[in-house]
Amino acid sequence: MFIVVDDFVIFYRSKTVAWIERQLQININKISEWTLKNGFTVSHNKTVGIHFFKDDGQFHKVPELKLGNNIIRFVAEHKFLGLIWDSQLTFHSHIKNLLTRCRKDLNIIKVLSYSNWGSDTKTLLKVFRALIRSKLDYGCMVYMNAKFKKDLEDLNVLHRQAIRLCLGAFKSSPIESLYVEANEPPLELRRKELAMRYGLKIKSNPNNPTHDSLFKLTSIESYKYDRYPPLAQSLNKLFEEANIPIENIAIKKIPDVPIWEQEPNSVCFSLASYDKSTTLPSFFKAKFNSDILPYYIDYTHCYTDGSKHNEIAAYGIYSSLGTVSKRISNDSSIFTAEMEAIKKILINIKSSARNKSKFVVFCDSKSVLESIGNQESKNPIMINILDILQDLKHKKIIVEFCWVPSHVGITGNERADSQAKAGLNTTIEPKNYRLPFSDYKPKVNEYIKGLWQQRWDHKHNRERVIKLHYLNPSIKPYHIYNLSRKDEVIIHRLRIGHTRLTHRYLMEDPFKQQPYCEYCDSDLISVKHILIDCLYFRRIRSRYYSAQSLKDLFDRYPPKYIIEFIKQAGLYNLI
C-alpha cells in the first residue's frame, strides 16, 4: 500500500483474480473500520479500481469489491500521482494528455523566439527546460518502454520542435544537429539518465516500497524475455553496460541521535572571509600563525586531506596520533575522500583519547566542514561522522574543526596533502567500499554522454549530411556571447549548415536539386562555399578572417567577425 498525503493505493498481484479480490476486500474492510473509529471517511465517489492485465485475447474477470455498502466501480484508466494509469499499462492516455499540456507551453516559446526581436537562446532554453522538459521528465522512467512506440515518437517530435524554435533553425535542419547545437540530449537518452539516477537513489534505501520490485533477482529474471521490459529489467541492463556496481552503494542511514537533540559542532571559517584568488599565500600563512594557532594552542592538531588523480582516490592524515595514507575506491568523489579522512581521524581520536581531551581538525574542504556544521546531511558517511562526534561529546572529548586554504604553505596541511598523494600510489585493500549513491552520478553522466557521442558519430558516418559534425566532432557545447537574437539565429543556422540562402530550394520543392552559387556559378551553394570558398566575396572576407576551413573559422574567430562579413556581403537578411 502507498500513502501520499490524503491519497492512497492498495495493490495485489496474483495469477488468480479470486485471491486478489479476497485480499483487497480484507484490507478495504480494515481501512473502513479504522476510519470509523478515528472520525474519518473514505469518499466512495473518489474510490476506483483498475484491473491490470496483459492483452492476451482472453476474458479477464473484474473483481467485485465493496467500500461499506457501496460497490467500488472499476475504470479503464485513472490518474494517480500525476500519471494516467491504464489497465494494460500502455500509457497512451498519459502521453496524449502530456502532449496537450506541452503544446500549450510551446506557444509561449513561439512568442518569445521571434528571430528578429526574440529572447536569446540561453534564456529560451531555460524556459523550455522549465515549462516543457520538466513535464517530459516527470515519471518518464515508468513509460520509457511504452508499448506504442509512436507515442514516444510524438514526444520526440514536440521536443525537437521546441529546440528548433529556441535555436531559430529551419525545419530542414538535421535532428541530431539540433540536439548538439542546443546541448540538449535526445529524449531517449534523457529517460535513461533519469531512470539510472532514480535507480541509484532507490538502491540506497531498501525500505522504499519500490526497492524489491527494481532489484530483487526474481523480479528481474521473471521479465527477462518480455517484449516490453519493465524498469527493473532496463535498469539491470543499463547498470551492467555502465559498469556501475550497484551492490556497493551505501545504505541510507538514520542518525543515532535525532537532529533536534544533537549538540552543535564547532567549525571555524575565519580564514574563509578572505578571497583566495586575490590573497597572497604568505598572508594566509601569517594569519594562520598569528590568529589560528594561538587560539588552539592547548589542542592536539590533526590535519586531513583527500586527493583524486587519474580516476584514483585516496586520503591522508597528519597528526601526533600518527600519519595515514590510504587509497579508496576509484569511484569515490573528492568529497567522499575528504569525509573518509575526517572519519578515520575521529575513529583514531575515539580509540586513543581520554576524557576532557581537546582536538582540532584542520581541513581544506569547505563543503565537508559546512556539512559538519549544519548537521543536516543525508550522506551516509557524513551521518557516521556526526554519530561519532556525538559519541565523543558524551565522553567529554572536545573536537573542533577549522578550515584552512590549501597550497599556501601551512605546514600541517602540506604534509597531509603529501600523505594523500602518497596514498594514490598504494594498493586498495581487498574490501568492498560502499559509496554514497551520489558518487556514481558522474559515471551515469559519462555513460550517457558516451552513448550520445556514439549516436552522433554513427549518424554522421552513415549519412554524411550532418555538416555540424565537421565543426563539432564531439558533443561539447559551443558558446555564443553578447550577440543580438538575430545574430545568434544566423550563427546557429550557419553552424548547422541549413540557411535560407542555401536550402530555400527544399522549402520550395523537396525533390529539387541543390542549385549552384548565383554569385560565382562555379560550385554548389553551401555554407562552406559562402564563408570560405566563393571568389565573389574574397575581398570582403579578407577584411575579417583568413580561415581555410569552417572548423578553423568557428574555432579561431569570434562570431561577431562572421556576422560583420555577412552584413558587408549583403547576405544578412538571406540567412
Where do the PLM segments sit?
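RNase H-like nuclease fold core
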Residues: L280-R354, I372, P380
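Catalytic palm subdomain of template-directed nucleic-acid polymerases
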Residues: F8-E33, K54, E370-N374
